[in-house]
Design a protein with these regions (language model features):
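FMN-binding flavodoxin-like domain, especially the glycine-rich phosphate-binding loop
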Residues: 1, 19-30, 35-148
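N-terminal beta1-alpha1 ligand-phosphate binding loop
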Residues: 1-21
Length: 148
């Protein structure tokens, strides 16, 4: 069973890939987009309804260069999961962000309130435009196969 929550289509892409490539009726796959370092609220609310299940988490985040960041997100999400459940695996990858994010960064850059890392934020925005990509999907499939 696959449930995902997608705001920009990134997590939907991962969820659709899983629908087409898995044949596992014993695991509940839950996908989310990242909001302030955690899963979006709808995904968290759904996870709280699950009990005595095997769960595979998958998600996307606009910032994607740090596996450590991805691990922090997954660990934060796990805090919302009832202890009767078993998280059997997880996958995170970078996802493209809406144009409004770039516009906000560019406006900030022109202001006197620009953070010191504004150029890195803009660079990350452009890098994220290519994600999730075929390599991300292959990595998701390979991880899922190892977990099962």
């Amino acid at each position: 069973m696959i449930h995902y929550f997608s705001q920009t289509g990134n997590t939907k892409l991962l969820g659709d890939f899983l629908k087409d490539n898995i044949n596992d009726s014993k695991t509940i796959y839950v996908g989310f987009w990242t909001d302030k370092g955690n899963a979006n609220q709808e995904a968290l609310d759904y996870l709280k309804t699950l009990h005595h299940q095997k769960i595979f988490l998958f998600g996307t985040a606009g910032f994607g260069k740090s596996e450590e960041y991805f691990k922090r997100i997954i660990n934060k999400v796990k805090e919302s999961i009832d202890s009767t459940n078993e998280v059997v695996g997880s996958f995170m990858c970078q996802g493209k962000m809406p144009d409004s994010v770039l516009q906000r960064y560019l406006s900030l850059k022109e202001s006197d309130k620009a953070p010191k890392n504004i150029d890195l934020l803009i660079e990350n925005y452009y890098e994220a435009l290519n994600h999730p990509n075929e390599e991300d999907l292959e990595n998701l499939g390979a991880l899922n196969n190892r977990v099962l």
